[in-house]
Amino acid sequence: MSALSEILSYLIISFETSFTFHLEFKYKRTGIEKNESGVLVTVPRGKERQSSSEILDVFTQHIATLWPETQSSDQENEEEGEELEDAVAKEINSLQKKNKKELLTPIMLDMPCVYFVKTRPPIDPVRLVEFTCEVGKTKKMTRYTQRLIPIVRTTGVSLDDLEELAKSLIDPLFHEGQEGIKEFAVQANIRNHTVLKKDDIYRTVARIVGKQHMVDLKNFKLLILVQVIKNIIGISIVQNFEELRRFNLNEVYKQPENTKSIPNDSKLDNFDRDKNQIINDKAEHAE
């Protein structure tokens, strides 16, 4: 039995070493790819690794609450007479499942003050971020993490790619089975990219939303977030953006109980109001 126990320990350690190497390899990825979803995280300079460690813990707890079906239901009630061969197979199978179904993957971007946490289905990045910020109103959960920017899906950086992705996300909320006028705004952030301009983004998004809806920079119900990172575009459409202090965990926690919105003269993180004011004109002349 002792020999078999040693074999079991050796196999488990070997597999865990391989699994850890696989995680480290993914951790060293330095870019976001097409057709991914996740959360862009901003941090103080040099605190990317510390932030990723704490936010993964927070997200893991919230995923267990929001999507309990993702949690393992295996009961580790090994019977006393269980064969070691079966125990080896069970342990390796468990590690393989973790490997294949990892729900959160941190990705450093070779850019200061920002990194990406990739998510897998059924995780909804918008719901995860909004829930985390709601919890953050009354509970200090992180030290190094600042803004959480959900990205529902990514695509290439051409105008055609932007239009296709934007349409797929905008239509269900603005057109398909929807009635009435919706107040909206657009926030475009561009990092490490020089070809696509904010005007291009505003013009394209405004045309897809259509003239039947209204831009309202102060009291918008829906905010269309467009992130351009190197050669990738990511988009999400969110609510409660200002109520949740632009998804900034530090600001959410400091928020007074009765505060409902951000003062108009507050400095928005890359939220270029002057640029957004041209959206109405762009929409009228886009067609």
UniProtKB/Swiss-Prot annotation:
Would you tell me the Gene Ontology cellular component terms?
cytoplasm; nucleus
Q: Name one GO biological process term.
A: tRNA acetylation
Q: Which cysteines are joined by disulfide bonds?
A: none
**What's an example of a GO molecular-function annotation for this chain?**
protein-tRNA adaptor activity
Q: Which stretches make up the THUMP domain?
A: 133-239
| One Pfam family matching this protein | THUMP
Region of interest called Disordered, as start-end residue ranges on this chain: 257-287
Sorted alphabetically, which CDD domains does this protein's record hold? THUMP_THUMPD1_like (cd11717)
Q: Per the record, where are the segments of Basic and acidic residues compositional bias? A: 266-287
Q: What is this protein called?
A: Uncharacterized protein C25H2.10c
